[in-house]
UniProtKB/Swiss-Prot annotation:
Plays an important role in the de novo pathway of purine nucleotide biosynthesis. Catalyzes the first committed step in the biosynthesis of AMP from IMP. GTP binds at residues 12-18, 40-42, 305, 331-333, 413-415. Homodimer. Substrate binds at V299, T300, T301, G302, R303, A304, R305. Mg(2+) binds at D13, G40. It catalyses: IMP + L-aspartate + GTP = N(6)-(1,2-dicarboxyethyl)-AMP + GDP + phosphate + 2 H(+). It is found in: Cytoplasm. This is Adenylosuccinate synthetase. The keyword Transport does not apply. The lineage of its organism: Bacteria, Bacillati, Actinomycetota, Actinomycetes, Mycobacteriales. Its main location: cytoplasm. GO terms for cellular component: cytoplasm. Signal peptide: none annotated.
Length: 429
């Protein structure tokens, strides 16, 4: 059976949790392959229960599904324990969660440096979540990071923390005028936390490849979105990892030839959290309408999301860089009750039309959207379960997005619930 990659095709917050939940009963494994608790997935179960997940894969809410936090994820031990406790308090079985031995741990000094750096930068800040994600990835690349397996050997953990703080305390004290951290206190804190998760540490690469050999289906669940990718996103306003499909193989330990489907998640309009370019951003009543109807508040940060019309330029770009085979279009219902629904089909930069993503950072910042107006619809579409049950104008809108994006729209979300979905083509096939 296949490995399926699920990725956000915009700037994150597209509705990836809903897609994972819908596929849940057809899956045996769900894997987070990058990012950390700087992103969130919201899942609404058929009984109306709502769960916000930050580190743990969305498959944890489906009985009998095995879940993996992969080697490409950076893990805050305290956040992991808090999230596990919250799920268990609500009756969720968390026994099927494994943590890669090679996943890097977010240490207290990562969070301290992240927060103080953003304050220091002021108006020039990137807009991070302040959760230590970037500094942890910096240590990973610099080969001085702490991995999950290190908590199983106190001597190694102590050596790594002491070496890290020898430099980082200089930064905190001499550059940012903050207090130094005590290495032994950091070690003791992490070892105490490790008591709650060390039994989950595993060679997850081996587990996943054995699962594929047995014919089981594995979903590789990305966080954030294509335009936040450190290589392919709107740099420097990006995250510190690779949410794109290429990062799925690296962050899970599954070979790329095992991947048969790349499912992109597209919101029927566009949103973004934090700083950075956003060509279709709205500052009028339409923007306020989308924000209100769509409940556009960040799951992790609580920050209001910026809103705009659908951007086909970035959708085409996402299709290309990810090799997307199928799209799941979410929140189509939010667009009900609009007379017209504009679609950005190209950009204008300094009087020149760009049908594809501009190459330079300056051009994307100065891009002006070129819109195509589509007739809207006023009907409530939340009860539609087949494509033909949608109003004709809604059907036309979906088909136009499909044409502009360059990949088949296999599923359409018409509400937040698992069952509020139209399936035009099965994803697991």
């Amino acid at each position: 059976m296949p490995a399926i990659v699920l990725i956000g095709a915009q700037w994150g917050d597209e509705g990836k949790g809903k897609a994972t939940d819908l596929l849940g009963e057809q899956l045996q494994w769900v894997v987070r392959y990058q990012g950390g608790n700087n992103a969130g997935h919201t899942v609404v179960l058929p009984n109306g229960d709502k769960f916000a997940l930050h580190l743990i894969p969305s498959g944890i809410l489906t009985p009998a599904v095995n879940n993996v936090i992969g080697n490409g994820v950076v893990v805050d031990p305290g956040v992991l324990l808090t999230e596990l406790a919250g799920l268990e308090e609500r009756g969720v079985d968390t026994s099927r969660l494994l943590l890669s031995a090679d996943a890097h741990l977010i240490m207290p000094y990562h969070v301290a440096i992240d927060k103080v750096t953003e304050r220091f930068l002021g108006a020039k800040k990137i807009g991070t979540t302040g959760r230590g994600i970037g500094p942890c990835y910096q240590d990973k690349i610099a080969r001085v990071g702490v991995r999950a397996a290190d908590v199983l050997d106190e001597k190694i953990l102590t050596q790594k923390v002491e070496a890290a703080l020898e430099f980082k305390n200089q930064v905190l004290v001499k550059i940012y005028n903050r207090k130094a951290l005590d290495p032994q206190q950091v070690v003791e804190e992490v070892l105490t936390q490790a008591e709650g998760f060390k039994h989950r540490i595993s060679d997850t690469r081996l587990e996943l490849n054995l699962a594929l050999e047995r014919g089981e289906t594995v979903l590789l669940e990305g966080s954030q979105g294509t335009l936040l990718d450190v290589d392919h996103g709107t740099y420097p306003y990006v995250t510190s990892s690779n949410p794109t499909s290429g990062g799925a193989a690296v962050g899970s330990g599954i070979g790329p030839t095992k991947i048969t489907t790349v499912l992109g998640i597209l919101k029927a309009y566009t949103t973004r959290v934090g700083s950075g370019p956003f060509p279709t951003e709205l500052f009028d009543d339409h923007g306020a309408y989308l924000a209100k109807q769509g409940g556009e508040v960040g799951v992790t940060t609580g920050r209001a999301r910026r809103t705009g019309w659908f951007d086909a330029v970035i959708a085409r770009y996402a299709t290309r860089v990810n090799g997307i085979t199928d799209y799941f279009l979410t929140k189509l219902d939010v667009l009900s009750s609009l007379d017209t629904v504009p679609i950005c089909v190209a950009y204008e930069v300094d009087g020149v039309r760009h049908d594809e993503m501009p190459m330079s950072q300056s051009d994307i910042h100065h891009a002006k959207p070129i819109y195509e107006e589509m007739p809207g619809w006023w009907e409530d579409i939340s009860e539609a379960r087949t494509f033909e049950e949608l109003p004709q104008n809604a059907q036309n809108y979906v088909l136009r997005l499909e044409e502009l994006s360059g990949a088949f729209i296999s599923c359409i979300g018409v509400g937040p619930g698992r069952d509020e979905t139209i399936v035009r083509r099965e994803i697991v096939r």
